[in-house]
Amino acid sequence: MTTQFRNLIFEGGGVKGVAYIGAMQILENRGVLQDIRRVGGCSAGAINALIFALGYTVREQKEILQATDFNQFMDNSWGVIRDIRRLARDFGWNKGDFFSSWIGDLIHRRLGNRRATFKDLQKAKLPDLYVIGTNLSTGFAEVFSAERHPDMELATAVRISMSIPLFFAAVRHGDRQDVYVDGGVQLNYPIKLFDRERYIDLAKDPGAVRRTGYYNKENARFQLDRPGHSPYVYNRQTLGLRLDSREEIGLFRYDEPLKGKPIKSFTDYARQLFGALMNAQEKIHLHGDDWQRTIYIDTLDVGTTDFNLSDATKQALIEQGINGTENYFEWFDNPLEKPVNRVES
C-alpha cells in the first residue's frame, strides 16, 4: 500500500466536489488517509478538507454530502428588490447563511462548538487545516491556518473560501473589515502549498525532498532577502485532487489537443473570454511536474453552480472520483513508470 503521502490538496469546483467522496474511498482503502498530517483546499475543496480534518470517516462524509440538498445553499430572499440591494451592498445574490449554519453544525458535532477556531482544531490533535481565500481589498490570496490565524473561526474561513463572486455575498473580516471572496479567484488549486522544507521531517524522510531548477532559482533570491527562512522544495509527500472535464484531463495529463468551441455571438465571446482568463489563472503557478502528484477526476461536464444535483448525478460523480484515483495509482505504482514524486524505499 502507498503510504508516502502526508499532505492532501483539494481543488475548488462547487458542487463537483461530491466526486471527492469516491476518491477518498480509494485513498482510505490504500491506507493513505491514516498518514495525512495536513490538508488544504479552496472553495468546495476547503469544505472537503474541513470535513476530513474534523475526523469524519469517509462513510460519514458520503452520508453528509449525499443527504445535503445543495439547492438550499441558494438562499436568496425570494424578492428581487431585496436581492438587488444585497448584491449592491454585500456583492452577492445569495446570503450564504444556510451554508454557514450547515457547516457550523458539522463543526459543532466534532468539536462541541460551532464557533471553533483553527487553534481548537489543533488542540484536538486533528490534521492541520489550510483554507484559501481571496482578499479583494488587497488583491491577493490568503492562507488561513493555525500558523497565522489561530483565533479565526473555521466556519468563517470556509465561508470565505466558498464565496463565489456575485453568487454568494462577500465576507467582511478582520480589523479593517476587508472584503473576502472565493479563494478560487486567485488560487483554485494550491498544490504547492506545502512546498517548503519545514513541512518535511528531513531526518526521517529525506527522500521526500526534490530539488528543482525553478525552486533553486527562487531560493537564491529568497534567501538573500530572508536568510534563515525555510527554502522551497518540491514536496513528494503532497498529493492533489483536481476536478476537470474529460477534455481538460486529456490536455493536462496526456497533452491531447482541445476541440474549439464556436463563437457566433457576443455571449459566446464573453463566455469563452472569461473561461480563458480563468484557465490562465488556474495554471499560471503550476509547473510541468505538478501533474505527477495530481489525481484528475472527470466532472462529467457538471457546472460549478449546478446545485440541483440528482442522486444519480451525485453517484456518477462519486464513481468518477473512484475511477480517477484508481487510474492514478495504477500509473504511480507501475514499476515501468518513473514518477518524479515517488519516494523510493
Regions picked out by a protein language model, each given a short descriptive name:
Residues 1-40, 50-345:
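Patatin-like phospholipase
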Residues 41, 45:
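Gly/Ala-rich beta-loop-alpha elbow adjacent to hydrolase catalytic centers
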